[in-house]
């Protein structure tokens, strides 16, 4: 049987007070619906039907490059009506897994448990027990067996006392699902076609109904307003922080880290407060990340130190290397083993060789720097002429004095020394000392201009 996933994502989300479709609001810099799509892939979906309605252009602009079957729900007439729009894309022998685009924290392990709980040609529904089930459909059982689901507005007093609620997530055989959807009625308090009504139909047809529950109730919580969205964000971050700690990271304060992607950490990693980790980030063993650092799509090797308020984006930091505080590695930058950049140093598409240092106030762009090089404060590689970029090459053991400009393309030979304040426009041979400063003049008897009083 193929696993056919239907994701309901047609709602506007009026309570969000936004022009953005509800399911595009982000958790950890990724839209809620993208979280659900990714989880569907994790459980081995063979096809994904995305039922959309409001904000179609924005949804397709955000998600359009993915392998999705787009299913329009022109009118929002309930969850049963929404699923029915995908009927043409469902085969009789499919297992249909129904998910929700605004329930982003559902875990693959929970869905795998739900699918495993489903008997042959049976219906499996995901339920959860809540201390306060107000607003949710209740699971009605007889002798322990599920016989139906009743919505809050249609429930009697006895049913309202039930704490086991329907999450809406279910796995069902394709053939029966299509038959049940054709029997739905809107004769209820909401005037909508409830997907939950198929549970009673399954019971009537003698179909085996089984249930599974998530590890945590937060997995099945949705976001209808920005307060709930923020609550889901905190829950996501808490889960991500816990995962890091279990993998070997020490978090100074687990409530003050922001994880917005996939991060892999080694042992004995120390992460201070207010660190942001985004995209795909790999952190080696014994790494220290200072407060306020931002790591984006980067690799940090063993024993490296990222000092406070540094930004490392699409860059590599080598073994025993360090950056910061207030340093910036832009895309294509790399610090080799034991290299160091200090405060207010920026690198872009540049390599700083083994043991080389740029301690402060420098820009290094489109450059290859060898081992044992000292880059003085205020050094700039002048790599752009307004139209084209050019390379600067600095070989091993070069000393670059403070306030030096290297006008690319230019090569500085091994062991050369560049005097402070020099502007280098031509290649420098190995071992040379180059000074291009204007000769210092001393003017005696000179008086500073005095401002005239008005």
Swiss-Prot record:
The family annotation for this protein states: In the N-terminal section; belongs to the N-acetylglucosamine-1-phosphate uridyltransferase family.
User: For Mg(2+), which residues are the binding ones?
Assistant: 102, 224
Gene name of this polypeptide: glmU
Instruction: Provide one Gene Ontology biological process annotation.
Output: lipid A biosynthetic process
Pathway per its UniProt entry is: Nucleotide-sugar biosynthesis; UDP-N-acetyl-alpha-D-glucosamine biosynthesis; N-acetyl-alpha-D-glucosamine 1-phosphate from alpha-D-glucosamine 6-phosphate (route II): step 2/2; Nucleotide-sugar biosynthesis; UDP-N-acetyl-alpha-D-glucosamine biosynthesis; UDP-N-acetyl-alpha-D-glucosamine from N-acetyl-alpha-D-glucosamine 1-phosphate: step 1/1; Bacterial outer membrane biogenesis; LPS lipid A biosynthesis
State the UniProt keywords alphabetically. Answer: Acyltransferase, Cell shape, Cell wall biogenesis/degradation, Cytoplasm, Magnesium, Metal-binding, Multifunctional enzyme, Nucleotidyltransferase, Peptidoglycan synthesis, Repeat, Transferase
Please identify the protein, giving its name as recorded.
Answer: Bifunctional protein GlmU
Give the cofactors, semicolon-separated: Mg(2+)
């Amino acid at each position: 049987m193929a696993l056919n996933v239907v994701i309901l994502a047609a709602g506007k989300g009026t309570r969000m007070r936004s022009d953005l479709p509800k399911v595009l609001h982000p958790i950890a810099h990724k839209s809620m619906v993208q979280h659900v799509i990714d989880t569907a892939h994790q459980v081995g979906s063979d096809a994904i039907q995305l039922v959309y309605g409001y904000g179609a252009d924005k949804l397709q602009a955000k998600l359009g490059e993915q392998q999705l079957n787009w299913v329009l729900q022109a009118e929002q007439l309930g969850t049963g009506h929404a699923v029915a729009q995908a009927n043409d894309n469902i085969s009789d022998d499919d297992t249909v897994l129904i998910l929700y685009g605004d329930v982003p924290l559902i875990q693959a392990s929970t869905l795998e448990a739900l699918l495993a709980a489903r008997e042959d040609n049976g219906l499996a529904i995901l339920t959860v027990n809540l201390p306060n089930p107000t607003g949710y459909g209740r699971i009605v059982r007889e002798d322990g067996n599920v016989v139906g689901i009743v919505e809050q507005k249609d429930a009697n007093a006895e049913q309202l006392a039930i704490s086991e609620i329907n999450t809406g997530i279910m796995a069902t055989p394709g053939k029966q699902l299509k038959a049940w959807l054709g029997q739905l009625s809107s004769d209820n308090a909401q005037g909508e076609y409830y997907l939950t009504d198929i549970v009673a139909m399954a019971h009537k047809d003698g179909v085996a109904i089984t249930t599974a529950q998530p590890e945590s109730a937060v997995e099945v919580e949705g976001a209808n307003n920005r307060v709930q969205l923020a609550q889901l964000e905190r829950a996501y971050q808490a889960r991500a922080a816990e995962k890091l700690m279990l993998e070997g990271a020490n978090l100074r304060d687990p409530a003050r880290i922001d994880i917005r992607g996939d991060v892999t950490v080694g042992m004995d990693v120390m992460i201070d407060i207010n660190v942001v980790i985004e995209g795909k980030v790999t952190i080696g063993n014994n790494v220290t990340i200072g407060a306020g650092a931002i790591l984006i799509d980067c690799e940090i090797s063993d024993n490296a130190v990222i000092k406070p308020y540094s930004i490392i984006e699409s860059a590599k930091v080598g073994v025993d290397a360090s950056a910061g505080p207030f340093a910036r590695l832009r895309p294509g930058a790399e610090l080799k083993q034991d290299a160091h950049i200090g405060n207010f140093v920026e690198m872009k598409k540049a390599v700083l060789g083994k043991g080389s240092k740029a301690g402060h106030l420098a820009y290094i762009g489109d450059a290859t720097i060898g081992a044992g090089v000292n880059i003085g404060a205020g050094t700039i590689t002048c790599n752009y002429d307004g139209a084209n970029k050019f390379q600067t090459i600095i070989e091993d053991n070069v000393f670059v004095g403070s306030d030096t400009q290297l006008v690319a393309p230019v090569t500085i030979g091994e062991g050369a020394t560049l005097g402070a304040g020099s502007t280098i426009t031509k290649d420098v041979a190995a071992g040379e000392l180059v000074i291009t400063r204007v000769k210092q003049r001393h003017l005696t008897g000179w008086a500073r201009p005095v401002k005239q009083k008005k």
